[in-house]
């Protein structure tokens, strides 16, 4: 007897995780090949703009708004052809409060996840596995200063206890994971909750929480304003400059999602799993290397930022106030190089400022993933450069020829 064909559904397909999942699912080889890959998005997107291939197995479904009620989302899912044949669901959607408020963002994401899983239960009757993407916020990293003794330093392990209220109310992944587990138990699905820290990669849209896209825009525009060979000081704090962290490239992350989902039938429910590229690094180590991609010279935080209580300070050539002074050049920049409009003018300064000032070590323990047999590793600088290659191809930043 032949086993039932594997069919994938990616919820949140145009984000930094979903975009790569599409490509990796199409590339997965036998015996874990997927006969179809259905991508769900809220806003319309073309295959060419997304840099997705023309492939008979690939289908894009737009207008799926997870912010609606469960009943409305179920109705939207019913309109997806062959939804009842889906076997593997990859939930990588992520909502964001317009003000970056943690509590409001948590509320949005919990509602989205519930609506999506209610729809899966109702119409995707052949589902075997739910691969949900969480993140390192479960370890309370953004709240470390306020948690005091309740914050447990890393390396962060999946066995660590949840942070207490009121901070737990700001971590949507707790309630999302609980709902995933409850629905999986109810429907005899296996499930995994994948926990990366920062994801390095490309997205065809100007995501407000994609570090490599935001940095790529900043670096490219900085090069345009100040010229080739300009010195670019790290715009974060001295403590953030030296803090250790782990990241993961979007392709490796996608392959880990696929690996855990296709091995669950034989290995059982994986549950929560940390993942990184296996390399512990710091801005001190990689900043000079990554800015070289743009022919810039990377330098430490400026001296005034390394003295006294200056952790929250910003570089004079970074942030919304600096950008306001050079805004006129942004339009010139896009026009001169024929770039997609409104990317540079919408750099996520608040998100960048937050990430570039995280002063605690945030290293993930990935032994559980290794024990499952996922042994991939990659280089952090190469992951950044790959994402910027995609941005050049998408005309979000100038090509090599234009930059010379």
Swiss-Prot record:
Main function: Short chain dehydrogenase; part of the gene cluster that mediates the biosynthesis of sirodesmin PL, an epipolythiodioxopiperazine (ETP) characterized by a disulfide bridged cyclic dipeptide and that acts as a phytotoxin which is involved in the blackleg didease of canola. SirD catalyzes the O-prenylation of L-tyrosine (L-Tyr) in the presence of dimethylallyl diphosphate (DMAPP) to yield 4-O-dimethylallyl-L-Tyr, and therefore represents probably the first pathway-specific enzyme in the biosynthesis of sirodesmin PL.
Binding site for NADP(+): 56, 58, 291
Pfam families linked: PRISE
Segments traversing the membrane: none
Protein name, UniProt field: Short chain dehydrogenase sirR
Keywords, comma-separated and alphabetical: Glycoprotein, NADP, Oxidoreductase, Signal, Virulence
Annotated source species: Leptosphaeria maculans (Blackleg fungus)
Keyword field contains GTP-binding: no
Signal peptide stretch: 1-28
Gene Ontology molecular functions: oxidoreductase activity
Active site residues according to the UniProt entry: 237 (proton donor)
EC number: 1.-.-.-
Glycosylation sites: 67, 157, 274
């Amino acid at each position: 007897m032949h086993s039932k064909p594997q069919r994938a559904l990616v919820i949140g397909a145009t984000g930094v995780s979903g975009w790569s999942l599409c490509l990796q699912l199409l590339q997965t080889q036998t015996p874990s090949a997927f006969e179809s890959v259905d991508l769900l998005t809220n806003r319309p997107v073309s295959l060419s703009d997304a840099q997705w291939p023309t492939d008979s197995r690939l289908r894009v479904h737009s207008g799926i708004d997870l912010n609606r009620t469960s009943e409305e989302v179920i109705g939207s899912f019913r309109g997806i052809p062959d939804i009842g044949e889906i076997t593997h669901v990859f939930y990588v959607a992520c909502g964001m409060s317009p003000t970056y408020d943690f509590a409001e963002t948590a509320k949005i994401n919990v509602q989205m996840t519930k609506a999506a899983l209610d729809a899966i239960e109702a119409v995707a009757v052949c589902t075997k596995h739910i691969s949900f993407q969480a993140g390192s916020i479960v370890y309370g990293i953004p709240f470390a200063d306020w948690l005091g003794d309740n914050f447990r330093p890393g390396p962060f392990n999946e066995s660590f206890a949840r942070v207490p209220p009121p901070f737990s109310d700001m971590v949507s992944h707790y309630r999302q994971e609980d709902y995933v587990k409850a629905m999986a138990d109810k429907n005899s699905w296996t499930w995994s909750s994948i926990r990366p820290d920062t994801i390095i990669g490309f997205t065809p849209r100007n995501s407000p929480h994609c570090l490599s896209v935001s940095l790529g825009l900043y670096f490219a525009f900085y090069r345009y304003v100040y010229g080739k060979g300009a010195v670019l000081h790290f715009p974060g704090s001295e403590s953030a400059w030296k803090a250790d962290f782990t990241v993961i490239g979007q392709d490796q992350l996608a392959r880990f999602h696929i690996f855990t989902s296709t091995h669950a039938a034989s290995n059982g429910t994986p549950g929560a799993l940390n993942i990184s590229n296996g390399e512990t690094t710091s801005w001190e180590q990689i900043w000079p290397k990554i800015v070289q991609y743009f022919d810039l010279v990377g330098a430490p935080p400026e001296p005034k930022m390394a003295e006294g209580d200056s952790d929250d300070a910003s570089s004079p050539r970074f942030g919304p106030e600096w950008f306001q002074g050079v805004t006129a050049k942004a339009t010139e920049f896009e026009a001169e190089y024929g770039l997609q409009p409104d990317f540079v003018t919408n750099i996520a300064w608040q998100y960048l400022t937050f990430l570039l000032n995280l002063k605690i070590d945030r290293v993930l323990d990935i032994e559980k993933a290794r024990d499952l047999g996922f042994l991939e590793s990659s280089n952090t600088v190469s992951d950044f450069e790959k994402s910027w290659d995609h941005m050049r191809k998408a005309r979000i930043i100038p090509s090599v020829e234009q930059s010379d």
